[in-house]
Amino acid sequence: MIELSYAPDVAGRRSNWPKGSGVNTWTAIRWTFAEDSPYVGTGLERMASDTHGGGGGRPVTPPPPGMHHLGCSRGVLLISSQRDAGHKTCDPAAGGTLTSVLT
């Protein structure tokens, strides 16, 4: 089980990730793992820190099945269940759902 909580202070900011990534809107989500999670200790909890002032650190490990790594800003993982489709994010207010990506 992966427990997720939003970081609304950075959610929805425009990305400075390379053009052509197919995503212009980001939802920042902080995550923690249950003690029995297979991802504990894999480095997934320790996302790359912000090294370029406004995003730019890359995630250090592959995402769990069904998730896409889109970038990392200020040490907060940014994910989406879709790479395009109107640039929807996992933010329920933007039409996405968290449960759909926790596969």
Curated annotation (Swiss-Prot):
Annotated GO biological process: biological process involved in interaction with host
Keywords: Signal
Leader sequence residues: 1-34
Annotated region described as Disordered, given as residue ranges: 1-20, 44-71
Protein name as annotated: Uncharacterized protein Rv2929
